[in-house]
C-alpha cells in the first residue's frame, strides 16, 4: 500500500471494529480513531449518558459531526459507531474519503461479544437482545453493504487475522 489512504470500518456492534481497527492501525503505522470514543472525549461523558440525555437523534448529530471532522484527516483508521450509517451524509462522506470495510458478524457472535457490555445503549431496553440485534441488522445491513468496498466476516477470527486480510485485500486494489 504505497500511499496512505483512510480506512473506515463499519458494521454492527460486536463485529470487532474497535479491536480490529487498533490492530490494523498498529500494523500499518496509521492513526486510529473510534467515533464513539471521540464523542466521549469531547463531551466528557460516556455514550450511554449522551444517549440518555440527548436521545438517539442528539447522539447521531454529534456522531455525524465527529465523523465528518475525522474523515477529513489523511492516513487514518476509523472505527465508526454501528448506527452511523443511518445518516446519508455520513455514508456519502465515508465512501468519498476512504476505503470502507464492512466487518460482518452473526447475531450469535454479537450476543456473545456484547452480553456483559453495559455501554451499549441500544441494548439497554426491555426487549430481548436477540430481537433488538435482528431489528438493527434488518435496518442497517443493507446500508453497510451499500457503501462497502470490502466485506469481511469476523466470526471465529482474531483481530490480527482480520487485519491481515484487510491489508491483503487493500494491496490487491
From Swiss-Prot:
Keywords: Amino-acid biosynthesis, Aromatic amino acid biosynthesis, ATP-binding, Cytoplasm, Kinase, Magnesium, Metal-binding, Nucleotide-binding, Transferase. InterPro entries: P-loop_NTPase, Shikimate/glucono_kinase, Shikimate_kinase/TSH1, Shikimate_kinase_CS. It comes from the Bacteria. Its cofactor is Mg(2+). It is an enzyme of class 2 (transferase). Its main location: cytoplasm. Binds 1 Mg(2+) ion per subunit. One of its GO terms (biological process) is amino acid biosynthetic process. HAMAP family: Shikimate_kinase (MF_00109). Catalyzes the specific phosphorylation of the 3-hydroxyl group of shikimic acid using ATP as a cosubstrate. Belongs to the shikimate kinase family. This is Shikimate kinase 1.
